[in-house]
């Protein structure tokens, strides 16, 4: 009996050798900071700034997904919650390619949101077995997919493009696989600005077709993600399906600002100090 008990106990670590949650594929999302800031509410001071050195397209995240369009989130991971100390060795590069566009929030708040919600779930795959591995692999994906280069034939430009133009421009980048893209609405001009590109990847990070619901071929089914101001992390404007025509890819120089993305603005630091007075 004792031997049987010991054997059973020895099996426990094997049964729970991986954190995370099983999933079907990954979705890599890159955003166009110019569109995000142009679509942001300009009436709020310092509400959106593009840090100096930010690439034309930057990282939003890498998300485990199920084939039906739903996705796991906030899984058991190692660590369960984001620990900045574990990614110090790559932080200088992360600040550039995975920037915070909202100076009232720290850059770490964006990384924390993405890791806690999505990175922990990816740990069911050995490739993402640690926090450092997750962020490292996401940057590798970003480096291997040249969205900005693929879009050179259509923009940036103040002239509108069509969804067909966009698909044709990125066909080489995506190896002909279907992908998703979403727009943001410019509050002033009411134009639809190309806000993000979402590519679907196999677990080995090779590109695959994205599943669709048939009615809206540029997005997954009824579980489409909403990235609004009521979410944790930087308050990105709400993304929506792009129209078939009159999609704009505005010039980056028209909105860029110099900003230190590693820390909050003066307003943010003052607010933090006020909150800590009673603690």
Curated annotation (Swiss-Prot):
Keywords: Disulfide bond, Endonuclease, Glycoprotein, Hydrolase, Lyase, Lysosome, Nuclease, Signal. GO terms for molecular function: ribonuclease T2 activity; RNA binding; RNA endonuclease activity. Disulfide bonds join 37-48, 200-210. The active site is at 60, 114, 118. Residues 1-17 form the signal peptide. Glycans are attached at residue 68. It comes from the Eukaryota. It is found in: Lysosome. Pfam families: Ribonuclease_T2. Expressed in the pharynx, hypodermis, muscle cells, sheath cells, intestinal cells, the vulva and tail regions. InterPro entries: Ribonuclease_T2_eukaryotic (IPR033697), RNase_T2-like (IPR001568), RNase_T2-like_sf (IPR036430), RNase_T2_His_AS_1 (IPR018188), RNase_T2_His_AS_2 (IPR033130). Its EC number is 4.6.1.19. It catalyses: a ribonucleotidyl-ribonucleotide-RNA + H2O = a 3'-end 3'-phospho-ribonucleotide-RNA + a 5'-end dephospho-ribonucleoside-RNA + H(+). One of its GO terms (biological process) is RNA catabolic process. It is an enzyme of class 4 (lyase). Probable endoribonuclease involved in the autophagy-mediated degradation of ribosomal RNA and ribosomal proteins in lysosomes. This is Ribonuclease T2 protein rnst-2. It comes from Caenorhabditis elegans. The gene is rnst-2.
